[in-house]
Regions:
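Bacterial N-terminal signal peptides that target proteins for export
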Residues: 2-13
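Short, flexible coil/linker elements and helix-boundary hinge sites characteristic
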Residues: 9, 143, 162, 210-211
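Acidic/polar, low-complexity intrinsically disordered N-terminal segments immediately downstream
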Residues: 4, 26-118, 122-127, 173-212
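Beta-strand residues in well-ordered beta-sheet regions across diverse protein folds
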Residues: 90-92, 131, 167
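Ser/Thr/Pro-rich, low-complexity mucin-like regions
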Residues: 161-178
Length: 212
């Protein structure tokens, strides 16, 4: 291999390194950027109030909802009146498996653009990312709220198609709620009680069939 080729390879490697570093630096700063105003306006108009989504509740990585279709779960989205890019997500009276108590979890989240890696997974226009950390938990209905350091919400929402998926990690007993990718159907809110009863019936049939 002649000297000229070696020199070109060296320059190519150096250039690739700095290009990678620049990309990483840009992605690291993405959380400081705001999503486009038009996209936020669309999100605030649709992703608001009570919304029923299908979730898998996991304990130590094991899906306790058992059914592939997940469990109907009611979330509340309330947008900030002082910060346009921010909202509060609330999950009330959540329980899983044989837990002897219910959990209410509340977390403030902020919208931001996707980084370069996320754009490869969530293709197309209209995607927003939202992150929130250190929410607070209330055990039982009359319990006092306590900050749960290390807990977080991380997810993605498309303002055009209304697709959404996110994870709620409570940082407690390795419990997570995983909202897998799905399209929001607002009509589910009024049918929540009936849908939940059907889930319980299907779950009982599943347990009987599998000897659980």
């Amino acid at each position: 291999m002649n000297t000229c080729i070696l020199k070109n390879i060296k320059y190519l490697l150096v250039f690739s390194f700095f290009l990678l570093m620049a990309s990483c630096s840009s992605d690291d700063n993405i959380e400081k950027k705001e999503s486009p105003t038009e996209a936020i306006d669309l999100a605030r108009n649709f992703l608001t109030g009570d919304i029923v989504l299908s979730t898998h509740a996991t304990l130590n990585g094991v899906n306790k909802t058992l059914l592939p279709t997940g469990c109907p779960t009611r979330f509340n989205f309330t947008w900030s009146t002082t910060e346009k890019q921010a909202f509060t997500i609330k999950l009330e009276d959540f329980t899983i498996g044989e837990m002897p108590f219910s959990i209410t979890y509340v977390c403030d989240a902020k919208c931001m653009p996707l980084n370069s890696w996320e754009k490869k997974e969530y293709k197309g226009d209209g995607w927003l990312k939202f992150n929130g950390t250190n929410g607070y938990i209330v055990l039982e209905k009359d319990g006092k709220p306590s900050i749960m350091n290390g807990s977080f919400v991380k997810g993605y929402y498309n303002v055009n198609t209304h697709e959404i998926n996110f994870i709620v990690d409570y940082n407690m007993m390795n419990v997570r709620s995983e909202c897998f990718l799905q399209t929001i159907d607002k009509s589910r809110t009024s049918k929540f009680d009936a849908e939940f009863k059907k889930y319980e019936a299907d779950l009982a049939a599943y347990k009987k069939e599998h000897g659980l």
